[in-house]
Amino acid sequence: MTIDNGAPVWIDLGAPDLESAKDFYRELFGWNYTSTGEDYGGYLMVDVGVPVGGAAPNMNEKGELDPSLPAWFTTYFEVDDIDAATADITAHGGQVFVAPMRIGDLGSMAIVAAPSGAAFGLWQAASFAGFDTSGRPGTAVWFESLTSDFDADAAFYRDVFGWRNVPEEQSDARYVTNATGQDTRAGLMDGQDTRAGLMDGQDTRAGLMDGRGALPHGVPSHWQVTFAVEDVDAAVATVLELGGAVHQPPMDSPNGRYAVVADPQGAPFGIIAT
C-alpha cells in the first residue's frame, strides 16, 4: 500500500477508562481489539476486519498514566522524513509536543500542532504503513480540522504537507480540502462558518474549517475524525443508549447523512452514511 506524504494514515483513541471505551466502540462500531503487549504500554490495535486505528489509556508527556487527561482521537499524517517534517513544523509556526520516537520496527511517530494549537500526529512508516480508507462501516473516512486561525493553518498545511487548499463551494462556511478528486483526504474549516478543503476528488478525506463561529466557548482548535456507519439515525440512538452525547443532530449533506457525537468519556467524533 502506497500512502502519499501528508495523507491521514492512522488514528488512535486516548481514554481515561480504556475498558469502558472498548465496550462503547465495540457496541457502536463492532470494533475488535488486539493487545500489542506490555512493551508498548498496553496499546491496542483496533480492527473491523481491516485496520481502524489504535487505543490506549491516557498518558502524559512522561509516559505515565494520567486519567485527568480528556478522551480524544488523534489523527496521524504520513511523512517521508519525520525529522525534516518536525523541523518544517516549527519553522512554519507550529509546535512539537512529542519529539520523533521509534516504535520498534513499525516506524516513527511524533505529536505536533498547527499554529492554531490543533494537535495531530506524524507517522513515518517502516514495516507498518497504517490504514487504508476503505469506507467500511466502523472505519475512519474523513478528517477535519476546526480552527480558530484559518488563514494561518491553511498556509501551514500547504507549506508543511504540500496541501492544495481547495475551496469547498458547497459549504456555507469557509472550508478547504487538501486536494481534489481521488487525492482528497482532509479538510480545514473556518470557525466563522466559512469553509475550504485540502484535497479534491474521490479520495478527498480531510478538510479545514474556520472554527471561530463553530467552536463552542472554551473548545480549542482540533482535528475531528468521522467514521462510516450504515444508518446515522440508528447510530445516534445507540450512542445515546450507551451513555454518549449528541453535539450535532443528524442532518443531510452533499456527502451523506451526518452527525457529530461524543462517547461517554467526552471524545467527540463524526458519523456519516454515504
Where are these regions (language model features)?
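Short, low-complexity cationic-aromatic patches
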Residues: 2-6, 17-18, 22, 63-72, ...
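Core segments of cupin and vicinal oxygen chelate
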Residues: 3-5, 9-51, 91, 99-107, ...
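Conserved donor-binding loop and adjoining core beta-sheet/short helix segment
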Residues: 49, 54-66, 191
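Surface-exposed beta-loop interaction hotspot
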Residues: 110-169
